[in-house]
Amino acid sequence: MITVSKEDYLKAILEAESEGEAVISATLAHWLSVSAPAVSMALRRLKKDGLVRVHKDGQVRLTAAGRRIAHKLTLRHHLIERMLFEIFGMEWFKVHDEAERLEHAVSPDFESKLLARLGRGGACPHGNLSELESPVSRRRRGLLLLAHAEPGKNYLVSGIYERDRRLLEFLEDRGIRPGARLHVTGRNYDQTLTLVTGAGKVALGVSAAERIWIRTAKNNSHPTSVT
């Protein structure tokens, strides 16, 4: 039987993979805010159910069956986020936490209605696709992390990793959201970026810049900024 707890572990493994992390027990303890013994017990159950493999180096990988369940849950999460944003008008930086609470309560019938209304394609309010992408896959689409942006160039925000609500609110207050135009003006010795956004001049640390995917803007117009 697939319990809510098992679904959460499988989805966390898939999401951590999509952010380029090597998934080990400590990764899951951090992502799910649980203890190391709790992770060990959960992994034993998932392994017994044929949903994960734990390699000799400690890395945790989804089996084909585990990956199918994780993909199904991430699609449901994606649809709920889009429903909250596109239909109910909830702010983009709030929908992830709400979808986390709702995703296990959605019936197959309701999910099919969401699919019919919204479609399987399309990006969530954070700019991410329903099929979670690895960093390699994003780079193949011409994206790069804001942390690697070149000073003097203009970019568009393509997607933002969505788990950190405080970071999302911080970015929103500074005009950094999916679709926003950025002009990178400089990089300090500690890799802090200085930007101009629609909200004005912004300084952004490397840890935040590594959560934001961008693409090069097609023209050279700068954001309309507030000075």
Q: Each predicted region: which residue ranges?
A:
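Mid-protein regulatory/catalytic core that forms ligand/cofactor-binding pockets
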Residues: E103-W213
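A short, conserved structural fragment
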Residues: K47-H55
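Key DNA-contact positions within bacterial/archaeal DNA-binding proteins
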Residues: P37, F93
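Basic, amphipathic "hinge/linker" alpha-helix immediately C-terminal to the N-terminal HTH DNA-binding motif
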Residues: G58-H77
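Short, hydrophobic-biased segments on the C-terminal half of alpha helices
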Residues: L43-R44
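Short acidic, hydrophobic short linear motifs in intrinsically disordered regions
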Residues: E19-A29
